[in-house]
């Protein structure tokens, strides 16, 4: 009987410990979410442009003046994501007439869904792996608290973990890591966030070979042996 009671107490303590750990994880996610939210809400918004884009959005969530199908080095579909970001900022930022306007919220979700399904391509891999996801994640994060769980799961499926691709080094690695961190924050997935930060930390080393990364003389190489301290390097250090 004593052993049975001890076992029950032990299991209860284990359960309590797991619950406490889960609560702490969620607190960390909320801290990260609020910091990201604060950063994005500091951006300026063009309410007039958001109204115009809202008015001319098609019923499927697209815009007629954007080419979603032609695959070229230039990525015209990027304009779709920039519009959604401005609209999401207008919806999320207090003090403007579009703040928490429900028709706007519906159209932003529609626009995210359209982009996710259409999955526009580019002749430049950077837009596929980094550029488009880095812009798609912002309006989705801004609307996170306004979405049902199934909407979050569906929409965040566009954000794919690219950190396992070892070809992504230096600044490119911090970019794909940021996408993963946002995905984890949007989905309340602590492990994805931790993996993203670990991926960023992996860039902090001296690259001895003729490859991308930090060098012994404190310079930064990107695009293989090219010296890029003032471009990619400055951006990498700011991360």
Q: Over which residues does each language-model region extend?
A:
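Functionally constrained cores in energy, signaling, and assembly domains
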Residues: 10, 46, 85
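Sec-dependent N-terminal signal peptides
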Residues: 6-15
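Aromatic-lined, polymer-binding surfaces characteristic
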Residues: 51-239
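Boundary at the C-terminal end of the N-terminal hydrophobic targeting segment
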Residues: 19-24
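N-terminal secretory signal peptides that target proteins for export/translocation
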Residues: 1-3
């Amino acid at each position: 009987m004593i052993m049975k009671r001890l076992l029950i107490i032990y299991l209860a303590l284990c359960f309590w410990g797991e619950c406490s750990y889960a609560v702490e994880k969620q607190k960390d996610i909320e801290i990260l979410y609020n910091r990201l939210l604060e950063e994005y809400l500091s951006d300026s918004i063009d309410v007039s442009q958001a109204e115009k884009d809202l008015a001319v959005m098609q019923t499927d969530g697209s815009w007629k003046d954007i080419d979603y199908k032609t695959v070229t080095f230039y990525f015209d579909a990027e304009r779709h994501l920039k519009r959604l970001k401005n609209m999401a900022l207008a919806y999320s930022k207090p003090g403007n007439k579009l703040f928490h306007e429900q028709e706007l919220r519906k159209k932003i979700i529609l626009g995210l869904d359209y982009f996710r399904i259409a999955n526009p391509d580019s002749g430049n891999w950077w837009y596929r792996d980094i550029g488009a996801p880095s812009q798609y994640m912002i309006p989705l994060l801004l609307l996170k608290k306004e979405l049902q769980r199934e909407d979050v799961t569906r929409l965040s499926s566009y954000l794919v973990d690219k950190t396992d691709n070892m070809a992504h080094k230096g600044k490119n690695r911090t970019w794909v890591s940021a996408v993963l961190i946002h995905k984890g924050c949007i989905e309340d997935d602590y492990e994805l966030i931790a993996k993203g930060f670990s991926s960023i930390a992996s860039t902090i080393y001296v690259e001895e070979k003729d490859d991308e990364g930090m060098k012994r003389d404190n310079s930064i190489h990107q695009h293989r042996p090219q010296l890029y301290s003032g471009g990619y390097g400055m951006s990498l250090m700011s991360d």
